[in-house]
Design a protein with these regions (language model features):
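N-terminal beta1-alpha1 cap of cysteine-dependent amidohydrolase-like domains
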Residues: 1-98
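Residue-level detector of short, conserved catalytic/binding motifs and their immediate flanks
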Residues: 9, 105, 137
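Structural signal for conserved beta-strand scaffold positions within catalytic alpha/beta enzyme cores
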Residues: 13, 47-49, 109, 127-128, ...
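Short secondary-structure capping/junction motifs at helix and strand boundaries
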Residues: 42, 100-105, 126-127, 148
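Short, flexible active-site-adjacent loop segments at beta-strand->alpha-helix junctions, enriched
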Residues: 70, 113-114, 145
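Short, amphipathic alpha-helical segments
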Residues: 79-83, 111, 130-133
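Catalytic nucleophile loop
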Residues: 96-121
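Pocket-forming structural segment of enzyme catalytic cores
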Residues: 122-150
Length: 150
């Protein structure tokens, strides 16, 4: 995608931190600001409080970033926010699978969101860790992802 084709790049940040103190949201904002600056892009960024306010974006954005957050994705399956997040992901998936859609929607899932997405797509078994962990864990690309532009 040529980001310069159509004015500002619209970015939706889905905040799953549930109002808890974190470094994730600050880092996401910084990375976006730096990326826009180094590519001479104008950004329109909107943040959505998914867990406390049940806020979710529509399909008008170019990029979606769904954050990490506290808690256990194994036990939130029946929480209102988790159900709404799954419906949002279903809407985004249907958008991208529609053959008449010319501009696909790109979603970056971070930590907690990545686990929710794995659960949604049945892409792996989400299970408890052996111990508390922080940092980067390896992920492996699925065969279908090798042809994706992002």
């Amino acid at each position: 995608m040529n980001w310069l084709e159509k004015g500002p790049v619209k970015v939706a940040i889905l905040d799953l931190y549930e109002g808890k103190a974190n470094q994730g949201m600050r880092c996401i904002r910084t990375i976006l600001h730096d990326w826009a600056g180094s590519n001479d892009l104008e950004l329109q960024v909107t943040e959505y409080d998914v867990r406390l306010r049940n806020e979710l974006p529509d399909t008008s954005y170019d990029i979606y970033i769904s954050s990490g957050g506290p808690g256990d994705p194994l036990i939130s399956r029946f929480d209102d926010w988790d159900i709404a997040w799954g419906r949002w992901l279903d809407k985004m998936t249907r958008w991208n699978q529609n053959p008449s859609t010319t501009r696909k929607k790109y979603i970056f899932f971070i930590c907690h969101s990545f686990q929710l997405a794995c659960r949604y797509f049945n892409a792996g078994l989400v299970c408890k860790r052996k111990s508390t962990a922080f940092g980067v864990f390896p992920i492996h690309m699925l065969e279908a992802g090798k042809d994706e532009p992002v």
